[in-house]
């Protein structure tokens, strides 16, 4: 499971 906010960080 991947989350978008982790990429933006």
Curated annotation (Swiss-Prot):
Protein localization: Periplasmic flagellum; Periplasm
Keyword presence, Ion transport: no
GO cellular component: periplasmic flagellum
Alphabetically ordered keywords of this record: Bacterial flagellum, Periplasm
Domain of life: Bacteria
Self-association state and partner proteins as the record states: The flagellum consists of an outer layer composed of two sheath proteins, flaA1 (44 kDa) and flaA2 (35 kDa) around a core that contains three proteins flaB1 (37 kDa), flaB2 (34 kDa) and flaB3 (32 kDa).
Function comment: Component of the outer layer of the flagella.
Protein name per UniProt: Flagellar filament outer layer protein flaA2
Organism: Brachyspira hyodysenteriae
């Amino acid at each position: 499971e991947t989350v978008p906010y982790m990429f933006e960080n």
